[in-house]
């Protein structure tokens, strides 16, 4: 018997009775509506456990029973949520994912605020110190003001904006080596060590386009639409320059020139929608061959300088992958024009140093952080301003997330979630494979290879085991020094630690158990070079997964997430990688053409969706849309298979929905959300995902079983005559 049983049993009864009454009232309203489902369970028992009652109440509270499910299922499933959940002033987007993230943040906050003696490892104590440095418990950040940045500017050679710069001895080569290879900052291009697409057991240096401050190239090129953003960007740059000692008029003039330079970069970048063919992007060449094409720097000297971090030599014959050779060639022409004059060189240095300054201002005093509010408002429609502890929890998770993960898992992750999730994944994999036999557009040989690839997909669930071993966890962060009163310096050290850790992978075989997300993350991912799907502990919670919920709800929410990630192995990019994660052609030509024809249907379908008269980019979102559609179908068929093998679950009280209908409602309600106009615009320009509404109505309108369950007439919006089907 629990010590506090009598106290809580009374609360349980009261809450239960209240929810049951609420259900009866709301269900009466629901059944009075013209589009309510037929009475399905008139004379049978209902599930009246606490989990079932709360689940039913949640489903009802999110719905808009006045909407027609056959016209707009998103409104039907989520209209109540949207009505009851205005976007908080500090947010640009508000929805199920964000709410769950905030719950996870609270768990982490409570753990981080424990005394040092409660932590299990040195890594966890470092996380606590970092969190305290972010919160600035001793007012060190405010006392120091701009000093940490001014000290850094001296170390990296000065900045003309603040007047402590001489062009006399400046060189682009030296500046890039200092900023990128010592401080891990950005500018002009990006590079990193990653898995080799064509030989996924090995690591290789990868070079790509990059170097913009604003989120998309469109922000620079669509001047009419983005004039507000560009004006806010210039204002932000000017404020930062003045805070660092520059004279306002002079700072504004010089920063305008930096924006013009960034605009030149934006013009030569390929849009994301044109970078979806991995075969075409991959260009493996020796380092000296890179030198022959865009010689604005000495590439061998640059990477030799980088390798000094790990005392490794690099040959001119070292193989690297260049994903944007045309960009580098065009960049060479731009650099040549700017380095021909003294003013041009000053602009180049101003740009490069700005890339460092803007990435570090959030670690300075409040005046610097406030300077960003105007630009944030222009970009996403909100100035931000969340509580410091929330910001610092997120920041600490980004920096030392596997130590945070150990605390989170001990506090909030239930052990039985892992085997249950594993079982669900296997059922969805089986359903996906079974469906391959029905695909008449796929030849037999490619189908057999696809089945082998599906079987070979590995999964990681919850968290990596090593994080609960203090000695192993400490090894990961042993080279990272964290001090309580050095927030700015902590982040300089984090940058160097991350750079060194990345470089050290170069001569190591690929570790297929390395996680790319921290355990508290509310998300999931697929890695094509590992042929692997990963589901962190953070998402294996209600409303995505709850052991007390009916299987229909768990398959509809978490099951579709699992099916989505699995289907990424066969989207327009994932399909180019074989079962071992290697990029090569393993499909029959005729099957490739049939696949492209079917994916064009998806491109056209989503390109016809609009938000505020702006079209969804069907090409840019193709991979995610394929995964959404395939994931829904695989999860639904897996649920049907589960339903056939198991005793029938009791219906939820007050709903009069079948469990098949509950599956679709649970799927849709995961995406209940609202965004500012600015955030939607940015999403349409940048995000590979379609807006939430279309992630619901797109896949459902393509799945005949949905229309059958909700009795949608052929030709209605949710049951179009012409449907798209890939997997």
From Swiss-Prot:
Disulfides per UniProt: 47-52, 70-712, 78-672, 134-392, 601-724
Primary localisation category: membrane
Gene3D superfamilies: Collagenase (Catalytic Domain), Neutral endopeptidase , domain2
Keyword set includes Glycosyltransferase: no
EC number of this enzyme: 3.4.24.-
Stretches assigned to the Peptidase M13 domain: 46-727
Annotated transmembrane regions: 45-65
Cytoplasmic side: 1-44
Ligand binding (Zn(2+)): 564, 568, 624
Molecular function (Gene Ontology), one example: endopeptidase activity
Location of the protein in the cell: Cell membrane
Pfam family, one: Peptidase_M13_N
GO terms classed as biological process: protein processing
Enzymatic class: hydrolase
PROSITE patterns xref list: NEPRILYSIN (PS51885), ZINC_PROTEASE (PS00142)
Cofactor (UniProt): Zn(2+)
Keyword list, A-Z: Cell membrane, Disulfide bond, Glycoprotein, Hydrolase, Membrane, Metal-binding, Metalloprotease, Protease, Signal-anchor, Transmembrane, Transmembrane helix, Zinc
Membrane topology classification: Single-pass type II membrane protein
Catalytic residues in the record: 565, 628
Family: Belongs to the peptidase M13 family.
Protein name (Swiss-Prot/TrEMBL): Endothelin-converting enzyme homolog
Organism, scientific name: Locusta migratoria
